[in-house]
């Protein structure tokens, strides 16, 4: 690990609730001592999209002074700043128009690439991506209630990123669009099992899908991960080292080993596509969790309200049409990428 570290924290966001999530994370960084470490400089990169939920720039840039005082540098990446930067790159012959469009235009991949670019420009050593619908905590399931615990996400990544190109943490909560389906004569469990088995691979398996569905669409944290400091190297499966796009740290000290993000037009999957580029990179799974609140059920968590049970993502046949189609699209996208690079 370097003696003096410039740590970047990147958010690609478009939600009005971003400020609340940011506050929770910054107080988490203070609680674990990172905001007071003189050899660690915290640099915040916020790439925001005003069209996603009809927000204003001030929804992202108007950060409370008590929070900014705990951060060393802050970079807000809006459309205007990015367009000026793209123009400079085009005029300087650094990128062609086609390359700039591929890299900086369209979807979450473009927002993540903007953060990557400004992090490299500011000589950031390590860059951590966090999502605006994830919180630094883990939830486990006991016999009668769920149990909550705080997680030192940044601190855990910092402990291990010096020995890797990428470190990736774990996720709990609502991490996939797979609902709890009420099977019936029209859509039987056996029908759905046969479909899953038809597209299955090392990542998509019926036993995993059934387990998530059995928990009402909720993924609980693995207690063995929480009670040990075990770090695992991510092995390559069918040409991919599968990672997620958040709770993700990238070692920027050797820029030639850093890969950009990509997603197809009007689609997601930027983390899966990046996974296919990592054959020559060392990727570690590190022992920290974030809770994914995909349906915004649990914003009160950030005010200290800890529920004793989690809502099930129910889906009877009346709603299963769209929900199952969404699940199928998600699984089919993953399967397509795996097949392309097999």
Where are these regions (language model features)?
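Active-site-proximal specificity loops/subdomain of glycosyltransferases
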Residues: 54-122, 146
């Amino acid at each position: 690990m370097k003696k003096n570290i410039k740590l970047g924290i990147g958010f690609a966001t478009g939600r009005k609730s971003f400020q609340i999530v940011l506050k929770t994370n910054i107080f988490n960084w203070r609680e674990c001592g990172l905001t007071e470490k003189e050899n660690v400089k915290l640099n915040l990169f916020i790439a925001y999209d005003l069209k996603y939920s009809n927000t204003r720039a001030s929804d992202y840039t108007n950060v409370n002074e008590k929070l900014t005082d705990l951060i060393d540098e802050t970079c807000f990446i809006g459309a205007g700043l990015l367009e000026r930067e793209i123009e400079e790159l085009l005029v300087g012959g650094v990128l062609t128009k086609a390359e700039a469009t591929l890299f900086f235009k369209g979807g979450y991949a473009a927002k993540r690439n903007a953060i990557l670019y400004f992090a490299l420009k500011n000589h950031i050593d390590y860059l951590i991506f966090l999502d605006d619908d994830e919180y630094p905590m883990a939830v486990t399931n006991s016999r009668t209630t769920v149990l909550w615990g705080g997680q030192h996400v940044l601190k855990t990544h910092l402990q291990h990123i010096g020995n890797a190109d990428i470190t990736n943490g774990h996720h709990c909560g609502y991490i996939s669009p797979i609902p709890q389906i009420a099977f019936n004569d029209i859509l039987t469990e056996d029908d759905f099992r046969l479909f899953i088995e038809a597209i299955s691979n090392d990542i998509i398996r019926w036993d995993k899908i059934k387990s998530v569905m059995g928990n009402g669409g909720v993924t609980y944290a693995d207690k063995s991960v929480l009670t040990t400091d075990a770090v695992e190297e991510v092995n390559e499966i069918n040409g991919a080292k599968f990672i997620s796009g958040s709770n993700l740290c990238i070692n920027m000290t050797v820029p030639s080993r850093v890969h950009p993000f990509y997603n197809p037009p009007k689609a997601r999957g930027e983390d899966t596509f990046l996974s296919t580029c990592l054959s020559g990179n060392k990727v570690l799974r590190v022992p920290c969790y974030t809770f994914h609140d995909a349906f915004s059920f649990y914003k009160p968590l950030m005010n200290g309200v800890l529920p004793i049970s989690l809502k099930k993502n129910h889906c009877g046949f009346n709603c299963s049409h769209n929900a199952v189609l969404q699940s199928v699209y998600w699984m089919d996208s993953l399967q397509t990428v795996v097949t392309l690079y097999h």
